[in-house]
UniProtKB/Swiss-Prot annotation:
Modified residues (Phosphoserine): S22
Any one GO MF annotation of this record: ATPase activator activity
Protein name: Myosin regulatory light chain sqh
Extra remark: This chain binds calcium.
Source organism of the structure: Drosophila melanogaster
Biological classification of the source: Eukaryota, Metazoa, Ecdysozoa, Arthropoda, Hexapoda
Gene Ontology BP term (one): formation of a compartment boundary
Entries under CDD domains matching the protein: EFh
Length: 174
C-alpha cells in the first residue's frame, strides 16, 4: 500500500516539474527538440522517462568516465525537481540561450531597489535602461513593459525575473 502512495506522490511531483517549465518548447525549433529527445533517451538508461543519478552514472561510465557521487549529486541538484524531458530541455535551454541565473537577474534589479521591496518605479527603470550601460531605446523599453508585471506604476522585478526564467503562469494557476 505504501508503495502506491509513494508512486502517486512521485507522479504528482513529476507532473509539477513538467508544468512549471512547459514554455521551454517555444525556445527551440522541431529539429532541435528532436535532437534533444535523442540525447535524453540515450541518458535515460532505464527508459522510465526520467533522468536519475543512476542514469547519469551509467551514461558517463559508458563513455569511460568514473564520476564520483558528489559530482553526480551536483549535476542532479541543478534541477529544481525530477528531470523529465521538459526539465532536461529547460536546463540545456538556459545554457544555450545564455541567460543569467535567476539570482543574478534579481540582484541586478535589486541594486536600484533602495527599499528592498521587489519593485521599481516604472519611470525610474525606464530612465536607467535608456541612460546607463548598454542603453535601451524607448521602443525596447515599451516592448519589455508590454508583458511586464506593472501595477500602480511599479515594475515587479521579482515576478518579471520569474517570468523570464520560467515563463508566464498558465491561466489555471493564477
Amino acid at each position: 500500500m505504501s508503495s502506491r502512495k509513494t508512486a502517486g506522490r512521485r507522479a504528482t511531483t513529476k507532473k509539477r516539474a513538467q508544468r512549471a517549465t512547459s514554455n521551454v518548447f517555444a525556445m527551440f525549433d522541431q529539429a532541435q527538440i528532436a535532437e534533444f529527445k535523442e540525447a535524453f533517451n540515450m541518458i535515460d538508461q532505464n527508459r522510465d522517462g526520467f533522468v536519475e543519478k543512476e542514469d547519469l552514472h551509467d551514461m558517463l561510465a559508458s563513455l569511460g568516465k568514473n564520476p564520483t557521487d558528489d559530482y553526480l549529486d551536483g549535476m542532479m541538484n541543478e534541477a529544481p525537481g525530477p528531470i523529465n524531458f521538459t526539465m532536461f530541455l529547460t536546463l540545456f535551454g538556459e545554457r544555450l540561450q545564455g541567460t543569467d541565473p535567476e539570482d543574478v537577474i534579481k540582484n541586478a534589479f535589486g541594486c536600484f531597489d533602495e527599499e528592498n521591496m521587489g519593485v521599481l518605479p516604472e519611470d525610474r527603470l525606464r530612465e536607467l535602461l535608456t541612460t546607463m550601460g548598454d542603453r535601451f531605446t524607448d521602443e525596447d523599453v515599451d516592448e519589455m513593459y508590454r508583458e511586464a508585471p506593472i501595477k500602480n506604476g511599479l515594475f515587479d522585478y521579482l515576478e518579471f525575473t520569474r517570468i523570464l526564467k520560467h515563463g508566464a503562469k498558465d491561466k489555471d494557476e493564477q
